[in-house]
Swiss-Prot record:
Its EC number is 2.5.1.6. This is Probable S-adenosylmethionine synthase 5. CDD domains: S-AdoMet_synt. K(+) binds at residue 45. Its cofactor is Mg(2+); K(+). Transmembrane segments: none annotated. L-methionine binds at residues 58, 101, 246, 277. Belongs to the AdoMet synthase family. The lineage of its organism: Eukaryota, Metazoa, Ecdysozoa, Nematoda, Chromadorea. InterPro entries: ADOMET_SYNTHASE_CS (IPR022631), S-AdoMet_synt_C (IPR022630), S-AdoMet_synt_central (IPR022629), S-AdoMet_synt_N (IPR022628), S-AdoMet_synthetase (IPR002133), S-AdoMet_synthetase_sfam (IPR022636). Keywords: ATP-binding, Magnesium, Metal-binding, Nucleotide-binding, One-carbon metabolism, Potassium, Transferase. ATP binds at residues 17, 167-169, 235-238, 246, 252-253, 269, 273, 277. GO terms for molecular function: ATP binding; metal ion binding; methionine adenosyltransferase activity.
Length: 404
């Protein structure tokens, strides 16, 4: 392999994976509260194992929510409607251990404060990442992994592949070329799919259908060659799945939720948290910033870090890194960010309109790369004349290969 070539791998999991199931339930709880009370403060964790769901956390809200009905509806939508599939929404036990948010946190963060002065709900570091290797400004390794799971979901729902069950995992390895800090996909090196299935399909037929109806439909033909490796249900039979096979917990798929191992991650999960929790809202804002810079042609790759202290509105630090793909230096890129984005939590919530019931879909197939989400709408940037002139200079032309 050439010194400028490298392999990178990302994974995804389906909506029926136990951890993702918990993420969706936590976000369904959040949405139910925000739909009735946009100012609700929600921190809801979900745990699942065979025949059991438990909600735990802190919620302060005027909403009235029937958790029994809500949880069962999410499980039904996912497709767990019989114990033979690993779970049954009709017979499972739903336990609720939800309490009020700490009044000390409320007083320090949001009570009697103007929106611009709302403090961060906790300390922490958050990252946003974007790359020009796909139209969605997402890493192709993760994008294809998500799409493989979604195609399985579609074929199961339509009945075309009746043997497919809700729990699955995918993984894609891509051979890249490094070009001046930018990443250019060359070919798909390896595809891994492990999907739960009914007991009446042979492994041979399962693998054949995965290749013909999933992989060949999802992955562009020009990226697959005779050397592409396939591991399809490599462990063999996968009948026992869902919570019967593994316990599930909210917030355990944070790399699947974000960039598939690219960029960086601050460690905070998203699901079940209202937007005053900067683990969520600031990570969305950092993605918004990174994507806006890439889509504006200011860099080909971008990593943004932001940090906060609990109860403090202004970020402690903001960092922009372009991996050498910009004609501008990091200080100049940061000036553009500061001129165009207000990263105080209250202003993030206002500008992205985050006090809405929009979160359950984010827990299904990744929080980024879907144009329906407001943080995926690249902002048109105001750039002063000198920086605009420099951004069209030789360094960027050389990196991108085209003149702007």
């Amino acid at each position: 392999m050439s010194k400028n070539k490298f392999l990178f791998t990302s994974e995804s999991v389906s909506e029926g994976h136990p951890d993702k199931m918990c993420d969706q339930i936590s976000d369904a709880v959040l949405d139910a509260h925000l739909a009735q009370d946009p100012h609700a403060k929600v921190a809801c964790e979900t745990v699942t194992k065979t025949g059991m769901i438990m909600l735990c956390g802190e919620i302060t809200s005027k909403a009235v929510v029937d958790y029994q009905v809500l949880v069962r509806n999410v499980i039904k939508k996912i497709g767990y409607d019989d114990s033979s599939k690993g779970f049954d929404y009709k017979t499972c036990n739903v336990l609720v251990a939800l309490e009020q948010q700490s009044p000390e946190i409320a007083a320090g963060v949001h009570v009697d404060k103007d929106i611009a002065d709302v403090g961060a709900g906790d300390q922490g570091i958050m990252f946003g990442y974007a790359t020009d290797e796909t139209e969605e400004a997402m890493p192709l390794t993760l994008l294809l992994s998500h799409k493989l799971n979604y195609k399985l979901h579609e074929l199961r729902r339509s009945g075309e592949l009746e043997w497919v069950r809700p729990d699955s995992k995918t993984q894609v390895t891509i051979e890249y070329s490094s070009e001046g800090g930018a990443c250019v996909p060359l070919r798909v090196h390896t595809v891994v799919i492990s999907t739960q299935h009914s007991p009446d399909i042979s492994l041979e037929d399962l693998r054949k259908e995965l290749i013909e109806k999933v992989i060949k439909v999802v992955i562009p033909g020009n990226l697959i060659d005779n050397d592409t490796v396939y591991h399809l249900n490599p462990c063999g039979s996968f009948v026992v799945g869902g919570p019967m096979g593994d316990a599930g917990l909210t917030g355990r798929k944070i790399i699947v939720d974000t960039y598939g191992g690219w960029g960086a991650h601050g460690g905070g999960a998203f699901s079940g948290k209202d937007p005053t929790k900067v683990d969520r809202s600031a990570a969305y804002a950092a993605r918004w910033v990174a994507k806006s810079l890439v889509k504006a042609g200011l860099c080909r790759r971008c990593l943004v870090q932001v940090s906060y202290a609990i109860g403090v509105a202004k970020p402690l630090s903001v960092m922009v890194f372009s991996f050498g793909t910009s004609a501008l230096n990091e200080a100049e890129l940061l000036k553009i960010v500061n001129d165009n984005f207000d990263l105080r939590p209250g202003m993030i919530i206002k500008n992205l309109d985050l006090k809405r019931a929009i979160y359950e879909p984010t827990a299904e197939n990744g929080h980024f790369g879907h144009n329906d989400f407001p943080w995926e709408q690249a902002r048109k940037l105001k750039i002063d004349k000198d920086l605009r002139a420099k951004s069209k200079g030789p360094a960027l032309v050389d990196a991108i290969g085209i003149a702007h």
